[in-house]
Regions:
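Solvent-exposed, charged interface segments at domain starts and junctions
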Residues: 1-24, 28-42, 209-228, 232, ...
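Terminal amphipathic alpha-helical/low-complexity segments used for targeting or macromolecular assembly
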Residues: 1-188, 196, 357-433
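Glycine-rich hexapeptide-repeat left-handed beta-helix
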Residues: 8-13, 25, 240-241, 247-425
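A generic short-segment signal for beta-strand/edge and adjacent turn/coil regions
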Residues: 16-18, 46-47, 150, 189, ...
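A near-ubiquitous, low-amplitude feature marking generic local secondary-structure context
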Residues: 17-20, 131, 137-141, 197, ...
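Conserved beta-strand and immediately adjacent loop positions that scaffold enzyme active sites
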Residues: 74, 202, 351
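Extended beta-solenoid/beta-helix repeat architectures
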Residues: 173-283, 299, 329
Length: 433
Protein backbone atom coordinates (compact mmCIF):
# COMPACT_ATOMS: atom_id res chain seq x y z
CA UNK A 1 0.00 0.00 0.00
CA UNK A 2 0.94 3.66 -0.31
CA UNK A 3 1.10 5.91 2.74
CA UNK A 4 1.30 9.65 2.06
CA UNK A 5 2.11 11.87 5.06
CA UNK A 6 1.36 15.51 4.36
CA UNK A 7 1.81 18.90 5.99
CA UNK A 8 -1.05 21.38 6.19
CA UNK A 9 -1.17 25.13 6.76
CA UNK A 10 -1.09 24.61 10.53
CA UNK A 11 2.64 23.84 10.27
CA UNK A 12 3.26 27.54 10.86
CA UNK A 13 1.79 27.20 14.37
CA UNK A 14 4.89 25.24 15.39
CA UNK A 15 7.05 28.32 14.87
CA UNK A 16 10.80 27.85 15.15
CA UNK A 17 10.47 24.09 15.66
CA UNK A 18 9.25 23.71 12.07
CA UNK A 19 11.52 26.23 10.34
CA UNK A 20 14.10 23.59 9.43
CA UNK A 21 11.99 20.44 9.19
CA UNK A 22 8.53 19.14 8.34
CA UNK A 23 6.16 19.02 11.30
CA UNK A 24 6.04 15.23 11.13
CA UNK A 25 9.81 15.07 11.80
CA UNK A 26 9.23 16.40 15.33
CA UNK A 27 9.51 14.03 18.27
CA UNK A 28 6.71 13.14 20.68
CA UNK A 29 7.39 10.20 22.95
CA UNK A 30 10.12 7.84 21.77
CA UNK A 31 9.63 8.44 18.05
CA UNK A 32 8.98 11.28 15.64
CA UNK A 33 5.45 11.60 14.27
CA UNK A 34 6.54 10.19 10.90
CA UNK A 35 8.33 7.26 12.52
CA UNK A 36 5.14 6.31 14.38
CA UNK A 37 3.20 6.10 11.11
CA UNK A 38 5.96 4.24 9.28
CA UNK A 39 6.17 1.70 12.11
CA UNK A 40 2.39 1.23 12.03
CA UNK A 41 2.61 0.36 8.30
CA UNK A 42 5.95 -1.44 7.85
CA UNK A 43 5.01 -2.73 4.38
CA UNK A 44 3.85 0.64 3.04
CA UNK A 45 5.65 2.74 0.48
CA UNK A 46 6.00 6.12 2.21
CA UNK A 47 5.40 9.35 0.29
CA UNK A 48 5.90 12.79 1.84
CA UNK A 49 4.31 16.13 0.93
CA UNK A 50 6.00 19.13 2.53
CA UNK A 51 6.41 22.85 2.02
CA UNK A 52 8.32 23.27 -1.28
CA UNK A 53 11.43 24.84 0.25
CA UNK A 54 11.81 21.82 2.57
CA UNK A 55 11.80 19.18 -0.16
CA UNK A 56 15.57 18.85 -0.66
CA UNK A 57 16.32 18.61 3.05
CA UNK A 58 13.39 16.22 3.59
CA UNK A 59 14.92 13.85 1.03
CA UNK A 60 18.03 13.71 3.20
CA UNK A 61 16.06 13.28 6.41
CA UNK A 62 13.96 10.47 4.90
CA UNK A 63 16.13 8.78 2.26
CA UNK A 64 13.80 5.78 1.95
CA UNK A 65 10.69 7.86 1.23
CA UNK A 66 9.43 9.47 -1.97
CA UNK A 67 9.28 13.24 -1.51
CA UNK A 68 6.92 15.34 -3.67
CA UNK A 69 6.35 12.34 -5.97
CA UNK A 70 2.66 11.37 -5.88
CA UNK A 71 1.89 7.65 -6.06
CA UNK A 72 -0.30 6.23 -8.81
CA UNK A 73 -2.19 3.58 -6.84
CA UNK A 74 -4.69 3.69 -3.98
CA UNK A 75 -3.22 5.73 -1.15
CA UNK A 76 -3.88 6.40 2.51
CA UNK A 77 -3.27 10.11 3.15
CA UNK A 78 -2.53 11.07 6.78
CA UNK A 79 -1.96 14.54 8.22
CA UNK A 80 1.60 14.72 9.57
CA UNK A 81 0.37 16.35 12.78
CA UNK A 82 -1.30 13.11 13.85
CA UNK A 83 0.17 12.28 17.23
CA UNK A 84 -2.07 9.85 19.04
CA UNK A 85 -4.52 7.24 17.87
CA UNK A 86 -5.16 3.54 18.24
CA UNK A 87 -3.24 1.28 15.86
CA UNK A 88 -6.50 -0.52 15.12
CA UNK A 89 -7.93 2.75 13.79
CA UNK A 90 -4.98 3.17 11.42
CA UNK A 91 -5.22 -0.36 10.10
CA UNK A 92 -8.98 -0.06 9.69
CA UNK A 93 -8.40 3.02 7.55
CA UNK A 94 -5.80 1.29 5.42
CA UNK A 95 -7.93 -1.82 4.94
CA UNK A 96 -11.01 0.05 3.73
CA UNK A 97 -11.97 -1.21 0.25
CA UNK A 98 -13.50 2.12 -0.71
CA UNK A 99 -12.76 5.80 -0.50
CA UNK A 100 -13.42 7.17 2.96
CA UNK A 101 -12.20 10.07 5.06
CA UNK A 102 -11.64 10.29 8.80
CA UNK A 103 -12.29 13.11 11.22
CA UNK A 104 -11.10 13.71 14.77
CA UNK A 105 -12.32 16.64 16.87
CA UNK A 106 -13.84 18.20 13.76
CA UNK A 107 -10.61 18.01 11.73
CA UNK A 108 -10.31 15.82 8.65
CA UNK A 109 -6.92 14.18 9.17
CA UNK A 110 -6.86 11.11 6.93
CA UNK A 111 -8.45 9.67 3.80
CA UNK A 112 -8.25 6.54 1.69
CA UNK A 113 -8.21 7.66 -1.97
CA UNK A 114 -8.40 5.74 -5.25
CA UNK A 115 -5.35 5.86 -7.49
CA UNK A 116 -7.22 7.73 -10.23
CA UNK A 117 -7.81 10.67 -7.87
CA UNK A 118 -4.45 10.83 -6.10
CA UNK A 119 -3.03 13.60 -8.29
CA UNK A 120 -6.13 15.73 -7.71
CA UNK A 121 -5.67 15.35 -3.95
CA UNK A 122 -1.95 16.07 -4.10
CA UNK A 123 -2.49 19.23 -6.15
CA UNK A 124 -4.84 20.73 -3.58
CA UNK A 125 -2.71 19.63 -0.63
CA UNK A 126 0.24 21.45 -2.19
CA UNK A 127 -1.96 24.53 -2.40
CA UNK A 128 -2.69 24.18 1.31
CA UNK A 129 -6.35 23.36 0.73
CA UNK A 130 -7.03 20.04 2.45
CA UNK A 131 -10.77 20.70 2.40
CA UNK A 132 -10.90 20.80 -1.40
CA UNK A 133 -8.46 17.91 -1.67
CA UNK A 134 -10.88 15.55 0.02
CA UNK A 135 -14.22 17.23 -0.76
CA UNK A 136 -15.43 14.40 -2.99
CA UNK A 137 -14.48 11.62 -0.62
CA UNK A 138 -17.51 10.00 1.01
CA UNK A 139 -19.00 11.26 4.27
CA UNK A 140 -16.22 11.22 6.87
CA UNK A 141 -16.13 8.81 9.79
CA UNK A 142 -15.42 10.16 13.28
CA UNK A 143 -12.59 8.36 15.10
CA UNK A 144 -10.57 8.89 18.27
CA UNK A 145 -7.31 10.63 17.38
CA UNK A 146 -5.30 13.69 18.37
CA UNK A 147 -3.51 16.15 16.10
CA UNK A 148 -0.77 18.32 17.56
CA UNK A 149 -1.43 22.03 17.13
CA UNK A 150 1.84 23.39 18.54
CA UNK A 151 5.05 22.42 20.26
CA UNK A 152 3.18 22.70 23.54
CA UNK A 153 1.10 19.67 22.58
CA UNK A 154 4.24 17.65 21.86
CA UNK A 155 5.55 18.47 25.35
CA UNK A 156 2.24 17.73 27.05
CA UNK A 157 1.54 14.47 25.23
CA UNK A 158 5.08 13.07 25.23
CA UNK A 159 4.84 11.18 28.57
CA UNK A 160 1.77 9.25 27.39
CA UNK A 161 3.39 8.65 24.04
CA UNK A 162 6.48 7.15 25.68
CA UNK A 163 4.19 4.60 27.33
CA UNK A 164 2.38 3.84 24.06
CA UNK A 165 5.56 3.70 21.97
CA UNK A 166 7.29 1.43 24.49
CA UNK A 167 4.35 -0.97 24.49
CA UNK A 168 4.33 -0.99 20.71
CA UNK A 169 7.98 -1.79 20.01
CA UNK A 170 10.07 -2.36 23.14
CA UNK A 171 9.48 -5.46 25.23
CA UNK A 172 9.98 -4.87 28.93
CA UNK A 173 12.29 -7.08 30.96
CA UNK A 174 14.77 -7.31 28.09
CA UNK A 175 18.46 -6.55 28.71
CA UNK A 176 20.57 -6.87 25.58
CA UNK A 177 23.15 -4.30 26.63
CA UNK A 178 25.36 -4.16 29.71
CA UNK A 179 23.92 -3.60 33.18
CA UNK A 180 26.90 -3.49 35.53
CA UNK A 181 26.87 -4.95 39.04
CA UNK A 182 25.78 -2.20 41.42
CA UNK A 183 23.26 -0.70 39.00
CA UNK A 184 19.72 -0.75 40.36
CA UNK A 185 16.70 -1.64 38.23
CA UNK A 186 13.39 -0.99 39.97
CA UNK A 187 10.53 -2.95 38.36
CA UNK A 188 12.86 -4.53 35.77
CA UNK A 189 9.94 -6.10 33.90
CA UNK A 190 9.15 -2.60 32.54
CA UNK A 191 12.75 -1.77 31.56
CA UNK A 192 14.28 -2.32 28.12
CA UNK A 193 18.06 -2.04 27.69
CA UNK A 194 18.99 -2.29 24.02
CA UNK A 195 22.02 -3.84 22.42
CA UNK A 196 25.27 -1.90 22.80
CA UNK A 197 23.96 0.25 25.65
CA UNK A 198 25.52 0.49 29.10
CA UNK A 199 24.01 1.10 32.52
CA UNK A 200 26.95 1.74 34.83
CA UNK A 201 27.38 0.82 38.50
CA UNK A 202 25.42 3.10 40.82
CA UNK A 203 22.88 4.16 38.20
CA UNK A 204 19.19 3.75 39.05
CA UNK A 205 16.45 2.98 36.52
CA UNK A 206 13.03 3.29 38.16
CA UNK A 207 10.10 1.99 36.10
CA UNK A 208 7.47 2.09 38.85
CA UNK A 209 5.72 5.03 37.17
CA UNK A 210 6.16 3.85 33.58
CA UNK A 211 8.55 2.11 31.19
CA UNK A 212 12.22 3.02 30.87
CA UNK A 213 13.73 2.47 27.42
CA UNK A 214 17.51 2.69 26.96
CA UNK A 215 18.12 2.56 23.22
CA UNK A 216 21.08 1.25 21.24
CA UNK A 217 24.58 2.38 22.29
CA UNK A 218 23.28 4.74 24.98
CA UNK A 219 25.09 5.15 28.31
CA UNK A 220 23.73 5.87 31.78
CA UNK A 221 26.67 6.93 33.94
CA UNK A 222 27.18 6.20 37.68
CA UNK A 223 24.75 7.74 40.18
CA UNK A 224 22.37 8.89 37.43
CA UNK A 225 18.65 8.43 38.16
CA UNK A 226 16.18 7.74 35.34
CA UNK A 227 12.48 7.70 36.25
CA UNK A 228 9.89 6.25 33.92
CA UNK A 229 8.20 6.84 31.67
CA UNK A 230 11.45 7.84 29.99
CA UNK A 231 13.41 7.12 26.83
CA UNK A 232 17.15 7.57 26.32
CA UNK A 233 17.92 7.78 22.60
CA UNK A 234 20.52 6.03 20.49
CA UNK A 235 24.12 6.91 21.42
CA UNK A 236 22.95 9.40 24.05
CA UNK A 237 24.70 9.79 27.42
CA UNK A 238 23.05 10.50 30.76
CA UNK A 239 25.83 12.10 32.79
CA UNK A 240 26.88 11.03 36.28
CA UNK A 241 24.53 12.34 38.95
CA UNK A 242 21.83 13.40 36.48
CA UNK A 243 18.17 13.25 37.50
CA UNK A 244 15.99 12.34 34.54
CA UNK A 245 12.43 12.74 35.80
CA UNK A 246 9.30 11.07 34.45
CA UNK A 247 8.10 12.04 31.00
CA UNK A 248 11.50 12.83 29.49
CA UNK A 249 12.47 11.68 26.00
CA UNK A 250 15.98 12.09 24.60
CA UNK A 251 16.49 11.73 20.87
CA UNK A 252 19.74 10.40 19.42
CA UNK A 253 23.23 11.61 20.37
CA UNK A 254 22.32 13.84 23.32
CA UNK A 255 24.49 14.55 26.37
CA UNK A 256 22.35 15.34 29.39
CA UNK A 257 23.16 16.16 33.02
CA UNK A 258 21.53 18.04 35.87
CA UNK A 259 17.77 17.74 36.41
CA UNK A 260 15.35 17.27 33.51
CA UNK A 261 11.60 16.71 33.82
CA UNK A 262 8.94 16.03 31.14
CA UNK A 263 11.15 17.42 28.40
CA UNK A 264 11.65 16.41 24.77
CA UNK A 265 15.13 16.57 23.25
CA UNK A 266 14.77 16.35 19.48
CA UNK A 267 18.33 15.01 19.16
CA UNK A 268 22.00 16.03 18.91
CA UNK A 269 21.68 18.42 21.86
CA UNK A 270 23.87 19.05 24.91
CA UNK A 271 22.90 19.84 28.46
CA UNK A 272 26.01 18.44 30.07
CA UNK A 273 25.95 20.25 33.41
CA UNK A 274 23.82 21.01 36.45
CA UNK A 275 20.72 23.13 36.01
CA UNK A 276 16.98 22.48 35.72
CA UNK A 277 14.98 22.01 32.54
CA UNK A 278 11.30 21.15 32.83
CA UNK A 279 8.25 20.78 30.56
CA UNK A 280 10.34 21.96 27.62
CA UNK A 281 11.20 21.16 24.01
CA UNK A 282 14.84 21.34 22.91
CA UNK A 283 15.67 21.43 19.19
CA UNK A 284 18.67 19.86 17.48
CA UNK A 285 22.24 21.13 17.85
CA UNK A 286 21.36 23.10 20.98
CA UNK A 287 24.01 23.57 23.67
CA UNK A 288 23.05 24.71 27.17
CA UNK A 289 25.81 26.18 29.31
CA UNK A 290 26.38 25.13 32.91
CA UNK A 291 23.60 26.13 35.32
CA UNK A 292 21.15 27.03 32.58
CA UNK A 293 17.71 26.95 34.22
CA UNK A 294 14.10 27.46 33.25
CA UNK A 295 10.86 28.01 35.13
CA UNK A 296 7.91 25.78 34.27
CA UNK A 297 5.44 26.94 36.94
CA UNK A 298 4.34 30.47 37.83
CA UNK A 299 4.38 31.56 41.46
CA UNK A 300 0.70 32.46 41.06
CA UNK A 301 -0.23 28.94 39.91
CA UNK A 302 -2.08 30.42 36.93
CA UNK A 303 -1.99 29.21 33.30
CA UNK A 304 1.17 30.07 31.39
CA UNK A 305 0.98 32.60 28.55
CA UNK A 306 3.20 32.24 25.49
CA UNK A 307 4.23 34.48 22.59
CA UNK A 308 4.54 33.43 18.96
CA UNK A 309 5.92 36.67 17.48
CA UNK A 310 7.71 39.88 18.35
CA UNK A 311 4.50 41.86 17.83
CA UNK A 312 2.59 39.69 20.29
CA UNK A 313 5.40 40.07 22.82
CA UNK A 314 5.79 43.83 22.43
CA UNK A 315 2.03 44.38 22.60
CA UNK A 316 1.76 41.99 25.56
CA UNK A 317 -0.79 39.86 23.68
CA UNK A 318 0.31 36.49 24.95
CA UNK A 319 -1.79 33.42 24.27
CA UNK A 320 -3.20 31.51 27.22
CA UNK A 321 -1.76 28.01 26.88
CA UNK A 322 -4.22 26.58 29.37
CA UNK A 323 -1.26 24.81 31.00
CA UNK A 324 -0.09 25.32 34.57
CA UNK A 325 3.20 23.58 33.76
CA UNK A 326 4.97 24.83 30.65
CA UNK A 327 8.66 25.52 30.27
CA UNK A 328 10.98 26.51 27.46
CA UNK A 329 10.90 25.99 23.70
CA UNK A 330 14.38 26.23 22.15
CA UNK A 331 14.88 26.29 18.38
CA UNK A 332 17.65 24.43 16.57
CA UNK A 333 21.26 25.63 16.76
CA UNK A 334 20.63 27.88 19.77
CA UNK A 335 23.27 28.18 22.54
CA UNK A 336 23.20 29.52 26.08
CA UNK A 337 26.04 30.72 28.28
CA UNK A 338 26.61 29.74 31.90
CA UNK A 339 23.86 30.63 34.39
CA UNK A 340 21.34 31.64 31.73
CA UNK A 341 17.79 31.70 33.11
CA UNK A 342 14.46 31.55 31.29
CA UNK A 343 11.03 32.61 32.48
CA UNK A 344 7.97 30.37 32.44
CA UNK A 345 6.77 29.46 28.95
CA UNK A 346 9.65 31.20 27.16
CA UNK A 347 10.05 30.78 23.40
CA UNK A 348 13.45 31.12 21.70
CA UNK A 349 14.00 30.86 17.96
CA UNK A 350 16.71 29.10 15.97
CA UNK A 351 20.33 30.21 15.68
CA UNK A 352 20.45 32.27 18.88
CA UNK A 353 23.42 32.77 21.20
CA UNK A 354 22.15 33.97 24.58
CA UNK A 355 24.02 34.71 27.79
CA UNK A 356 23.97 36.87 30.91
CA UNK A 357 22.64 36.35 34.42
CA UNK A 358 19.54 38.54 33.94
CA UNK A 359 16.30 36.65 33.27
CA UNK A 360 15.80 36.21 29.52
CA UNK A 361 12.61 37.66 27.96
CA UNK A 362 9.59 35.44 27.37
CA UNK A 363 10.17 35.72 23.62
CA UNK A 364 13.44 35.88 21.66
CA UNK A 365 13.27 35.78 17.83
CA UNK A 366 15.49 33.62 15.66
CA UNK A 367 19.10 34.66 15.05
CA UNK A 368 19.62 36.90 18.08
CA UNK A 369 22.93 37.31 19.91
CA UNK A 370 23.66 38.80 23.32
CA UNK A 371 22.12 39.36 26.72
CA UNK A 372 18.99 41.21 27.86
CA UNK A 373 19.54 44.91 27.31
CA UNK A 374 22.08 44.48 24.52
CA UNK A 375 20.61 42.07 21.99
CA UNK A 376 21.74 42.28 18.38
CA UNK A 377 21.35 40.23 15.22
CA UNK A 378 23.30 37.00 15.02
CA UNK A 379 24.77 37.36 11.54
CA UNK A 380 24.22 34.34 9.34
CA UNK A 381 27.80 33.61 8.23
CA UNK A 382 29.33 33.31 11.73
CA UNK A 383 26.22 31.47 12.89
CA UNK A 384 26.63 28.86 10.14
CA UNK A 385 30.36 28.60 10.85
CA UNK A 386 29.60 27.82 14.49
CA UNK A 387 27.02 25.25 13.41
CA UNK A 388 29.59 23.53 11.20
CA UNK A 389 32.09 23.32 14.05
CA UNK A 390 29.48 21.94 16.45
CA UNK A 391 28.38 19.30 13.96
CA UNK A 392 31.96 18.27 13.19
CA UNK A 393 32.34 17.37 16.88
CA UNK A 394 29.68 14.70 16.33
CA UNK A 395 31.15 13.67 12.98
CA UNK A 396 28.24 15.15 11.04
CA UNK A 397 28.70 17.44 8.04
CA UNK A 398 26.43 20.44 7.48
CA UNK A 399 24.47 19.41 4.39
CA UNK A 400 24.12 21.89 1.55
CA UNK A 401 20.33 21.66 1.80
CA UNK A 402 20.39 22.49 5.53
CA UNK A 403 22.82 25.36 4.96
CA UNK A 404 20.40 26.78 2.39
CA UNK A 405 17.48 26.38 4.81
CA UNK A 406 19.34 28.25 7.55
CA UNK A 407 20.03 31.15 5.19
CA UNK A 408 16.44 31.17 4.00
CA UNK A 409 15.20 31.13 7.61
CA UNK A 410 17.47 34.08 8.42
CA UNK A 411 15.73 36.12 5.72
CA UNK A 412 12.29 34.74 6.51
CA UNK A 413 12.54 35.82 10.16
CA UNK A 414 14.10 39.23 9.44
CA UNK A 415 10.96 41.36 9.87
CA UNK A 416 10.12 39.73 13.21
CA UNK A 417 13.70 40.19 14.42
CA UNK A 418 13.97 43.78 13.20
CA UNK A 419 10.76 44.75 14.99
CA UNK A 420 12.00 43.14 18.19
CA UNK A 421 15.53 44.55 18.11
CA UNK A 422 14.24 48.00 17.14
CA UNK A 423 11.93 48.07 20.15
CA UNK A 424 14.74 46.88 22.41
CA UNK A 425 17.01 49.65 21.12
CA UNK A 426 14.35 52.27 21.85
CA UNK A 427 13.90 50.87 25.36
CA UNK A 428 17.65 51.18 26.00
CA UNK A 429 17.74 54.73 24.67
CA UNK A 430 14.59 55.90 26.45
CA UNK A 431 14.23 53.78 29.58
CA UNK A 432 10.88 53.96 31.34
CA UNK A 433 10.91 55.16 34.95
Amino acid sequence: MNLCIYEDIEAQAFGALALLRPVFALRCGIFTLAEKLALAFPEARVHLLVRPHLEDWTRELFPDADVAEPPEDDTLFVNGRLCMTDDEVLHFMAASPQEVSYVAQGILFAAKVRGSRVRHVVRHLREGDAERAFEDVRLPAEVQAFLARSGEDLIRWSPRQIVQDARYLFQGGIVRGSVEPGAHLIKPEAIHVARGSRVMAGAVLNAEGGPVVIRENATVEPLAYVEGPAAIGESSIVRAGARIRAGTSLGPVCRVGGEVAETVFQGYANKQHDGFLGHSFVGEWVNLGANTNNSDLKNTYTPVRTFASAREFLEKRGRDSGQLLLGLTLGDFTKTGISTSFTTGATVGIGCNLFGTELQPAYVPSFVWGQPGSFQEHRIDPMVATAERAMERRKVALATALDALLRRAHEETKSDRDLYLGAMAVARRDPQP
